[in-house]
Amino acid sequence: MIKRLGPRRWQRLHRIVYAIALLATVHYWMQSKLEIWEPTIMAGIYVWLMGYRLLLKTVGVRGRVPLPWLAPLALAAPLLTAAGEALYFSLAYGAPALRVFEANFSLQTGLRPAAIVFALAVAVSLVSAVRNWLSSPKPRPRFA
């Protein structure tokens, strides 16, 4: 399939799919009225995935993103998720954005979307680190 499409068309197809995924997330968010828990998680995962793709393209080494770059991404995606949820409630319902943002980091309100995105980002980063460690070339013993 890739060979038939050619590299340019394949890249174009990927860009179209990224745009469709963004539109699908926005559509999901618009269809949810007050319960925007799931669309917010979807948006956070999308932010993390697009950040990963960007890092892979800019700092990736042999198809992998180094762990020091994944850690800030694992922090940025949940923060953007919490900010998106706070912005939504502030614009749609007039709720204080700072209070909604702070609620994402309180355990009294249960697991919020930012916490779930953080857990997923950390889990994927750890799996990536273990995978890199297991596949790294091991020094071979030298015999005299």
Question: What are these regions, as identified by a protein language model?
Answer:
Residues 1-144:
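Membrane-embedded alpha-helical bundles that constitute the cytochrome b-like, heme-associated redox core
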